[in-house]
Amino acid sequence: MKFLVVDDSPTMRRIVVNSLKRIGYSEIVEAGNGEEGLEVLDPSVEFVITDWNMPVMGGLDMVRAIRSSPDTASLPILMVTTRSVRDDIVQAAQAGVNNYVVKPFTPQVLKEKIESVLEKMKGAA
């Protein structure tokens, strides 16, 4: 499974990438903001992990763009962010985020959230 990891922090991208590798995923492409994420998003990407707050284009705007395209509308999306209040989680879900991880997190939490998204999507198919 190929992942797209979008975060403006190189350190955070490294943490997410290393966590993905620790739980068995090795095909990963990275981007520093939502606009870059959309540029590198191609049909080989099967799962998106994004931050919320980023310059140029934030995570929610990128999610809305992904959801608005028939080619990518059903792509699984996980948001990894420091925003943890209920209204933020609701707003992310309304934009089309499938699940939500609050920073900091462990590789195990990331794995559980990814598996949860994939199970829900499999059940909906």
Residue ranges and their predicted role:
Residues E30-F47:
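Acidic, metal-coordinating helix/loop segments flanking the phosphotransfer/catalytic sites
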Residues M54:
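Receiver (REC) domain active-site loop signature in two-component systems and cognate sites
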Residues R83-S84:
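Short, conserved "switch-loop" micro-motifs in signal-transduction and mechanochemical regulators
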